[in-house]
């Protein structure tokens, strides 16, 4: 026997296997979704179909057939991309009307669309692709089962009353105040035998606008995965807790919009969508229904807030009490959880522009405060009725005369305790006249002795005369100085040196020379200022400023008048002998001549000043 040798394949066999393998990789394949698919009667359905591994032109043709359960072997032509006469009679009218159509996505992919499913549309759908290949290899059609479910989704407005009451047949019209809560309920249920999820959302359309996807603005909704999501304009309010959505029981959903705003007005709808999970794991919406919940009007505070004042123009005397009443009116929500109010009084002097300055106010918590310049006075601001506020000045002054206005502000509460001003209103002006005290003051001041020298004490006297005024008038006097700079008075305001108040208490300011100062009352209407150890820095123009004060019944003081004396010049002279010691460093003889010259000059100047005076 000869040795065994391995059997060699013919050279053409490996090549043939490779060709067969390559042809298998390029075999035609038609792909449709995995079934069965569940859809609801009356809704739209889309079934995709695409082909791969084909030969021939890039644009392939597609034909759709239906095999009904009662005739599983009978193919009913639905629609074709090639033949317009392809449809069987049962589909012809629907195809012509566009209710059933095939839409090409690209050359090798299409989608079958049925606008409104009917119960007889259930069955096996086949997508067939006529061959354009050189050899018949692969699959030329794909099949998927479609099951049509009855429409059992129900959506309606939830009745505001207890369970069991029927919702009204027509949508109600609701009116809420700005800042109040807007609460709406929706009933959504389904009895589909398959496992489905409901997504429920609340939407709003502007008043009188037609309802549609383009006009309906989503407020908030619960998705099919139970996540709560708000529409873009409401996302911030949802995050802040002003917007809430919850499920009560098995089929009731409740939306609460806290702190209603003017932009919340409109027609509210509830939309329920039923979702099912297809065999490929994706979720598909199989039904959707919408119900009108209510037509909502938001009554803004700015359109309702009104302020009136009384009792009318007032004329009173100084020291008399002044009472003014302010009434806040309008269809307003009560102060509390959703709304808050503040009320204040403003006063502007007669003829002054603008509302003026704040006198007193009650804030949103009912805490009173006085405006700048009114501290220390007996002024009361109180609430005397549900919407009536009273301002009382225990003792009016002439400076209280002017135009009074009452200012009311309305606030709404946002999330937590945050307040947002929603409206404000001012009353008409209320004139108040206060008689003047009729006090006339005059003051005469002079330097005692006429001439003062350095190191001495300068005494300045001020006599005050008074005409008119009530009994018990008190006088006060203060001394002021203006310093010269380069021979002229400085533009700096006068500086207080000292004075005696209406209560007899002395007040000391700052003396230019820094030495001791004394102020005293030397007579009923005579005041004296003394500058001890006078120095060159004390040079200046002094004046006396008296003022008249009246104490009212509330023990507050009111300045009833003031005056200013004429200027008093204080010039500290040097003693003549002091000048002899200045030039000793340059010789005694020169000092005597210089001293005599200076002495003569000073004496001459002094005599000239006396003659001028």
Swiss-Prot record:
The modification Phosphoserine is found at residue 518. One of its GO terms (biological process) is skeletal muscle tissue development. Member of the immunoglobulin superfamily (IgSF) that links tetraspanin-enriched microdomains to the actin cytoskeleton and plays several important roles in innate and adaptive immunity. Acts as an inducible receptor of HSPA8 on dendritic cells to enhance the CCL21/SLC-dependent migration of activated mature dendritic cells while attenuating their antigen-specific stimulatory capacities. In complex with alpha-actinins ACTN1 and ACTN4, regulates actin dynamics in the immune synapse and subsequent T-cell activation. Inhibits the entry of several viruses such as hepatitis C Virus (HCV) or HIV-1. A motif (EWI motif) lies at residues 274-276. It comes from Homo sapiens (Human). The lineage of its organism: Eukaryota, Metazoa, Chordata, Craniata, Vertebrata. Residues 1-27 form the signal peptide. Residues 601-613 are cytoplasmic. Residues 28-149, 162-286, 303-424, 431-560 form the Ig-like C2-type domain. The keyword Nucleotidyltransferase does not apply. Keywords: Cell membrane, Disulfide bond, Glycoprotein, Immunoglobulin domain, Lipoprotein, Membrane, Palmitate, Phosphoprotein, Receptor, Repeat, Signal, Transmembrane, Transmembrane helix. The chain crosses the membrane at residues 580-600. It comes from the Eukaryota. One of its GO terms (cellular component) is membrane. Glycans are attached at residues 50, 327, 463. The Ig-like C2-type domains 3 and 4 are required for interaction with CD81. The short cytoplasmic domain is very basic, interacts with membrane PIPs, and mediates plasma membrane localization. SMART domains: IG. This is Immunoglobulin superfamily member 8. Interacts directly with CD82, CD81/tetraspanin-28 and CD9/tetraspanin-29. Also interacts with integrin alpha-3/beta-1 and integrin alpha-4/beta-1. Interacts with HSPA8; this interaction modulates migratory and antigen-presenting capacities of dendritic cells. Residues 28-579 are extracellular. A lipid is attached at residues 604-605 (S-palmitoyl cysteine).
């Amino acid at each position: 026997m000869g040795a065994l040798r391995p059997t060699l394949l013919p050279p053409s066999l490996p090549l043939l296997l490779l060709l067969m393998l390559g042809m298998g990789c390029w075999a035609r394949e038609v792909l449709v979704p995995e079934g069965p698919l569940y859809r609801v009667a009356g809704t739209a359905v889309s079934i995709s179909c695409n082909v791969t591994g084909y030969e021939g032109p890039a644009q392939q043709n597609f034909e759709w057939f239906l095999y009904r359960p009662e005739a599983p072997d009978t193919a009913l032509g639905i629609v074709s991309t090639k033949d317009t006469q392809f449809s069987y009679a049962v589909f012809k009218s629907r195809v012509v009307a566009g209710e059933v159509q095939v839409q090409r996505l690209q050359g090798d992919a299409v989608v079958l669309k049925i606008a409104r499913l009917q119960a007889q549309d259930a069955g096996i759908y086949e997508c067939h692709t006529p061959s354009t290949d050189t050899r018949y290899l692969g699959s030329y059609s794909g099949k998927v089962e479609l099951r049509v479910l009855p429409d059992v989704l129900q959506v309606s407005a939830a009745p505001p009353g207890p369970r069991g009451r029927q919702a009204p047949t027509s949508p109600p019209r609701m009116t809420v105040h700005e800042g109040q809560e807007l609460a709406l309920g929706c009933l959504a249920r389904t009895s589909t035998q398959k496992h489905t999820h409901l997504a429920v959302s609340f939407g709003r359309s502007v008043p009188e606008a037609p309802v549609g996807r383009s006009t309906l603005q989503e407020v908030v909704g619960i998705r099919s995965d139970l996540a709560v999501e708000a529409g873009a304009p409401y996302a911030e309010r949802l995050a802040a807790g002003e917007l809430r959505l919850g499920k009560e029981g098995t089929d009731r959903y409740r939306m609460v919009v806290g702190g209603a705003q003017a932009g919340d007005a409109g027609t509210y709808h509830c939309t329920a969508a039923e979702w099912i999970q297809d065999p490929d794991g994706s979720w598909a919406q199989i039904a959707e229904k919408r119900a009108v919940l209510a037509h909502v009007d938001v009554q803004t505070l700015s359109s309702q807030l009104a302020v009136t004042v009384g009792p009318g123009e007032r004329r009173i005397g100084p020291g008399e009490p002044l009472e003014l009443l302010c009434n806040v009116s309008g269809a307003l929500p009560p102060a509390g959880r959703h709304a808050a109010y503040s009320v204040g009084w403003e006063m502007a002097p007669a003829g002054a522009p603008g509302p003026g300055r704040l006198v007193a106010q009650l804030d949103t918590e009912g805490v009173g405060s006085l405006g700048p310049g009114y501290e220390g006075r007996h002024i009361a601001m109180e609430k005397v009725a549900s919407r009536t506020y009273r301002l009382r000045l225990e003792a009016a002054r002439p400076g209280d005369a002017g135009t009074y206005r009452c200012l009311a502000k309305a606030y709404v509460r946002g999330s937590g305790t945050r307040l947002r001003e929603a409206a404000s209103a001012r009353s008409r002006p209320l004139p108040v006249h206060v008689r003047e005290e009729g006090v006339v003051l005059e003051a005469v001041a002079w330097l005692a002795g006429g001439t003062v020298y350095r190191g001495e004490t300068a005494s300045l006297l001020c006599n005050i005369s008074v005409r008119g005024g009530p009994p018990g008038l008190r006088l006060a006097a203060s001394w002021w100085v203006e310093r010269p700079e380069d021979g002229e008075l400085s533009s700096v305001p006068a500086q207080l040196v000292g004075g005696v108040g209406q209560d007899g208490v002395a007040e000391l300011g700052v003396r230019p020379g820094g030495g001791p100062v004394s102020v005293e009352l030397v007579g009923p209407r005579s005041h004296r200022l003394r500058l001890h150890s006078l120095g060159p820095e004390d040079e200046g123009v002094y004046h006396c400023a008296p003022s008249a004060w009246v104490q009212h019944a509330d023990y507050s003081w009111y300045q009833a008048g003031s005056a200013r004396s004429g200027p008093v010049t204080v010039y500290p002279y040097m003693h003549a002998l002091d000048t002899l010691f200045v030039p000793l460093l340059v010789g005694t003889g020169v000092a005597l001549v210089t001293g005599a010259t200076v002495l003569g000059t000073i004496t001459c100047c002094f005599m000239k000043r006396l003659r001028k005076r």
